Amino acid sequence: MSIPIKYMVSSVFEYQNAGGMKDNLKIEINYMIRCHILPVTKRKVNLPWLSEDLSVLSVAPMEIFASKIVALINRTAPRDLYDIHNLLEFGFFDESEQNMLRKCVVFYSCIGSEKVHNKFAFESLDKMPQNKIKTDLLPVLNFGAYFDLKPAREKVINYLQNLLNLNPQEQEFINQFGKGHFMPELLFDGDILENVKEHPMAKWKCDKTRKNRSEQEC
């Protein structure tokens, strides 16, 4: 998805890694997603070279994993499959949290995808080849780590098919968003609705959709 440059600051920092190779760290500040569904959390960061306690503000874990689920569906990267498989293996969210997780996925799917899809499809996951695990995932894991694609993929797909069984209100949110109408009250209420009702990315995408539809009708 192409975000106007005035809404984003992007910096690339080059460095030499422990192996003596040139690498880079890219940091992007996207002002269009500065509103969050859930309150931010304070998390401790453990750095081997720092003796003092360090804590940073972080997006709520549920929103992070909702975004990862959307990324997995959209780009089918091995690292996203690995992350969602770990979500299931370690039981990060219990049954009572699945409803909110689904709503977060629906929300971020609409604002974060190039095209709004009326339903979630997982066919691309079935086509992920084992060699992509070797080339794209294993190099960033601990030495000697192994990831068995077939059972992990099956487990993740089964989970997502159950999780993303949308109710009528959630489906209507997607339908309306695809027409350029942002109606967060179909997903949320109370404080959460207040948090997102003026979400800049959602409003920008809906404005853009309505403008494109209007131009096509002319």
Predicted feature residues:
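Structured mid-to-C-terminal alpha-helical surface segments
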Residues: 1-218
